[in-house]
């Protein structure tokens, strides 16, 4: 794969304006000579020669920062409303929807790189990262150079680029697509969040395949209702290209809703149960689990009259579904089924996704997982309960993030109390909230169940490791791959994996 290139060459303003079509009203400036050096919606990121897009955000209105952007060197501004007084020395583009304009301008600035890639999008509450990373591994192992964009990072070959958001803003997203194309990628696999769909971050992208993993309560502080949340997720399937197909988890109650606007011949369905009504038999992929350990599962997969064995290097029935959907994407794209299964079984471990950490004598196992919703916590605990020896204990350390959906806190407390033998409540990115107040709300769902409450996450993990006996399994949930603890706007370095490794190293 070629060397990764950072940045992009300049673009003629006239060419960018053309990408907006007739909807943009243009005033002022000298577009004939203007060369744009960058596109951004963040006035703090403006550099001389940039085009600033004034987006009305959830917290702040970009129109209030137009002056700051011009002072920083912006030579053009796209906005929905002109300032009361404005200078003709700057080119003004008045647009009906600044979010869509940001996506269109960014795509044009980076040379329509996304059109040169086979795009595969994965959406759902849980399982996006695992499924997307599995698809990426499968494509690369099958000879299709693929980049990945998702939770925490963008990966192009062996090069990792940190990301703040699961699905970045359009200017960042199209920069990443450009880097992928320049590095020789033929495909991009990306997690597509509900926020990104509603906020038009993926506007103008057309997907060869789109995957729905599941839908459970999450982000209701943003979407307000499950119906709105489901509708947001379904928007992804409206962006399939002419050859595009959907892969739907038929076991999810919203499966039929997700597929409702698609022609039957564009839908593949996956099931580990008895759900057979969603798809034509030739388009059904079914898995039956035959063996499970903390190291992973084995399953028999049937599809289109064929039956094959599938090795899943992650524990839990839900990870069988994640791999089944990744496999279905491969078959849908024309990859040889045996090749697809071999590459999936050999996929690299995913940080913070059922990541196993063992004591030196391998008698005790800790599992780090990103489970931070009620459904994810329940599935993780159920998966580990199924592989915990009858004479051993299952323990969990977890908390709930601050400044996020408060409704889930007592529910997660209830789930932990019901499914684990030992529970330790602790902090998980309290952000601007009082950590003890968050734990009070989690505790409210535990119905008096005996547990420990240790707000210091490192101390909570240390105590949990001390309590482990031979054969016991400890789930440390909520943060997964994250290497920080966010407190009052400051991200302090902290890694569950590093903390566990240190605790096991000290164990006699």
UniProtKB/Swiss-Prot annotation:
Which InterPro entries does this chain map to? Folylpolyglutamate_synth_CS (IPR018109), Mur-like_cat_sf (IPR036565), Mur_ligase_C (IPR004101), Mur_ligase_C_dom_sf (IPR036615), Mur_ligase_cen (IPR013221), Mur_ligase_N (IPR000713), MurE/MurF_N (IPR035911), UDP-N-AcMur-Glu-dNH2Pim_ligase (IPR005761)
Q: Which organism is it from?
A: Chlorobaculum tepidum (strain ATCC 49652 / DSM 12025 / NBRC 103806 / TLS) (Chlorobium tepidum)
What about PTM? Answer: Carboxylation is probably crucial for Mg(2+) binding and, consequently, for the gamma-phosphate positioning of ATP.
Name the residues that bind UDP-N-acetyl-alpha-D-muramoyl-L-alanyl-D-glutamate: 43, 166-167, 193, 201
* The protein's Enzyme Commission number: 6.3.2.13
Name the chain's protein. UDP-N-acetylmuramoyl-L-alanyl-D-glutamate--2,6-diaminopimelate ligase
Q: What is the lineage of its organism?
A: Bacteria, Pseudomonadati, Chlorobiota, Chlorobiia, Chlorobiales
Q: Residue positions of the PTM N6-carboxylysine?
A: 233
Could you tell me which cysteines form disulfide bridges?
none
Localization of this protein: Cytoplasm
Cellular-component GO terms for this entry: cytoplasm
Q: Which cofactor does it need?
A: Mg(2+)
Instruction: Cite the binding residues for meso-2,6-diaminopimelate.
Output: 404, 428-431, 478, 482
Sum up the protein's function in the record's words: Catalyzes the addition of meso-diaminopimelic acid to the nucleotide precursor UDP-N-acetylmuramoyl-L-alanyl-D-glutamate (UMAG) in the biosynthesis of bacterial cell-wall peptidoglycan.
Predominantly, its location class is cytoplasm
Substrates-to-products reaction catalysed: UDP-N-acetyl-alpha-D-muramoyl-L-alanyl-D-glutamate + meso-2,6-diaminopimelate + ATP = UDP-N-acetyl-alpha-D-muramoyl-L-alanyl-gamma-D-glutamyl-meso-2,6-diaminopimelate + ADP + phosphate + H(+)
| Top enzyme category | ligase
Report the residue ranges where the short sequence motif Meso-diaminopimelate recognition motif is annotated in this entry: 428-431
- Family assignment from sequence similarity: Belongs to the MurCDEF family. MurE subfamily.
Annotated metabolic or biological route of this protein = Cell wall biogenesis; peptidoglycan biosynthesis
Q: Which Pfam families match?
A: Mur_ligase, Mur_ligase_C, Mur_ligase_M
- Which controlled-vocabulary keywords does the entry list? ATP-binding, Cell cycle, Cell division, Cell shape, Cell wall biogenesis/degradation, Cytoplasm, Ligase, Magnesium, Nucleotide-binding, Peptidoglycan synthesis
What GO MF terms are annotated? ATP binding; magnesium ion binding; tetrahydrofolylpolyglutamate synthase activity; UDP-N-acetylmuramoylalanyl-D-glutamate-2,6-diaminopimelate ligase activity
The residues that the entry says bind ATP are 124-130
Q: Please, one GO biological process term? A: cell wall organization
Taxonomy, superkingdom: Bacteria
């Amino acid at each position: 794969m070629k060397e990764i290139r950072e940045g992009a060459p300049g673009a003629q303003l006239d060419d960018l304006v053309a990408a907006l079509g007739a909807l943009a009203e243009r005033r002022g400036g000298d577009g004939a000579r203007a060369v744009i050096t960058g596109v951004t919606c963040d006035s703090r990121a403006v550099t001389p020669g940039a085009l600033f897009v004034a987006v009305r955000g959830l917290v702040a209105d970009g129109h209030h920062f137009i002056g700051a952007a011009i002072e920083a060197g912006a030579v053009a501004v796209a906005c929905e409303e002109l300032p009361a007084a404005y200078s003709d020395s700057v080119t003004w583009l008045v647009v009906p929807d600044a979010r869509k304009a940001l996506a269109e301008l960014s795509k044009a600035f980076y040379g329509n790189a996304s059109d040169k890639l086979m795009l595969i999008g994965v959406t759902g509450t849980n399982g996006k990262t695992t499924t997307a990373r599995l698809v990426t591994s499968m494509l690369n192992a099958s000879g299709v150079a693929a980049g990945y964009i998702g939770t925490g990072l963008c990966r192009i070959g062996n090069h990792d680029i940190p990301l703040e958001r699961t699905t970045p803003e359009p200017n960042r997203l199209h920069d990443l697509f450009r880097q992928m194309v320049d590095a020789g990628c033929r495909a991009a696999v990306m997690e597509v969040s509900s926020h990104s769909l509603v906020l038009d971050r993926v506007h103008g992208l057309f997907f060869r395949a789109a995957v729905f993993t599941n839908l459970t309560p999450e982000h209701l502080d943003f979407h307000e209702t499950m119906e709105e949340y489901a509708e947001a997720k379904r928007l992804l399937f409206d962006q399939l290209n002419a050859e595009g197909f959907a892969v739907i988890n038929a076991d999810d109650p919203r499966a039929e809703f997700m597929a409702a606007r698609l022609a039957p011949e564009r839908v593949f369905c996956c099931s580990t149960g008895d759900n057979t009504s969603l798809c034509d038999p030739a388009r059904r992929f079914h898995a039956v689990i035959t063996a499970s350990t903390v190291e992973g599962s084995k399953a028999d997969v049937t599809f289109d009259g064929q039956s094959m064995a599938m090795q899943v290097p992650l524990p839990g029935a839900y990870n069988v579904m994640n791999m089944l959907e990744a496999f279905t994407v491969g078959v849908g794209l024309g990859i040889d089924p045996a090749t697809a299964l071999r590459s999936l079984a050999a996929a690299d471990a995913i940080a913070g996704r059922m990541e196993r950490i063992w004591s030196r004598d391998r008698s005790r196992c800790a599992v780090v997982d990103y489970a931070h919703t009620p459904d994810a916590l329940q599935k993780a605990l159920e998966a580990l309960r199924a592989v915990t020896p009858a004479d051993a204990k299952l323990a969990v350390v977890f908390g709930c993030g601050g400044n996020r959906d408060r409704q889930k806190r007592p529910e997660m407390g209830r789930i932990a109390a019901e499914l684990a033998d030992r529970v330790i409540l602790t902090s998980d990115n309290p952000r601007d909230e009082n950590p003890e107040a968050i734990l009070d709300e989690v505790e409210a769902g535990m119905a008096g169940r005996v547990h420990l409450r240790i707000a210091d996450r490192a101390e909570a993990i240390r105590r949990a490791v001390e309590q482990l006996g031979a054969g016991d399994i400890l789930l440390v949930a909520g943060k997964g791959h994250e290497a920080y603890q966010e407190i009052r706007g400051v991200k302090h370095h902290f890694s569950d994996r590093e903390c566990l490794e240190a605790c096991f190293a000290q164990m006699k």
